[in-house]
Amino acid sequence: MSKSNTYRMLVLLEDDTKINKEDEKFLKGKPGKMHEFVDELILPFNVDELDELNTWFDKFDAEICIPNEGHIKYEISSDGLIVLMLDKEIEEVVEKVKKFVEENN
């Protein structure tokens, strides 16, 4: 974790993995998904500000997640890291996420 105690959101694109025969021999198990790092966004609250976190995510859910239900998911850790995964097929939503973070900072 960084020295800052603000929440950080890692934005990843998730896609089905296509493995060729040559690569398959190097893998112990066949991965189901591939994740591509897109961006790291700093959120406007600290890890000890749970009320602010909940309020912010209520709005984030309403504006970003619910309209894209089934194609977006996130995990929030207690150490200030949020991992947001979007299906590759809705890659254009990344810009909406960035705009949301900027406008709600």
UniProtKB/Swiss-Prot annotation:
- Gene3D superfamilies registered for this protein in UniProt: YML108W-like
Q: Which SUPFAM superfamilies is this protein grouped with? A: Hypothetical protein Yml108w
Entry's InterPro entries?
DUF1892, YML108W-like_sf
Recorded hits in Pfam families, A to Z, give: DUF1892
Transmembrane portions of the chain: none
Highest taxon in the source lineage: Eukaryota
Q: Where is the signal peptide?
A: none
Q: Name one GO cellular component term.
A: cytoplasm
KW Acetylation (keyword) present? yes
Q: Which residues carry this modification: N-acetylserine?
A: S2
Keywords linked to the UniProt accession: Acetylation
What more the UniProt record tells us is: Present with 2610 molecules/cell in log phase SD medium.
What protein name is recorded for this chain?
Uncharacterized protein YML108W
Taxonomy, top ranks, is: Eukaryota, Fungi, Dikarya, Ascomycota, Saccharomycotina
